[in-house]
Amino acid sequence: MAMILVTSQKIREAAENLGQLNRQFKGKTEELTTREQALCQMWEGQAKNAFHGAFERDSRQMEAFHGLVNKYVQVLLEIAQRYEQAEARNAEIAGGRSY
C-alpha cells in the first residue's frame, strides 16, 4: 500500500498556491465582466438581453466558486494550525516523560 506523507508546511504551501490561483481567477472574472459591459454597450436587442442574462448567471456561479475556494483555503490553513498544535503538545508530553 502506498504511503502519503504530509506536513503542515506542505498544507500551507498548497493553501497559498490555491489562494494565488483563486486570486488570478477573480482577476480574470473581473476582466470578463468589464468586457461584457463594454460589449453590451455596443449591442441591442433580444440576443444582447439573452447573452447578458446568461452572463449574469455565470457570473454568480463564478463568484460562488471563488468564495468556496477561499473557504477551502481557510480550512487548509486551520488544518495545518491544528496539526502544528497537536504536534507541539505531543512533543511536550513526550519530552516530559521520565522512567
Task: Describe these PLM feature segments.
Residues M1-Y99:
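Amphipathic alpha-helical hairpins/coiled-coils and adjacent low-complexity
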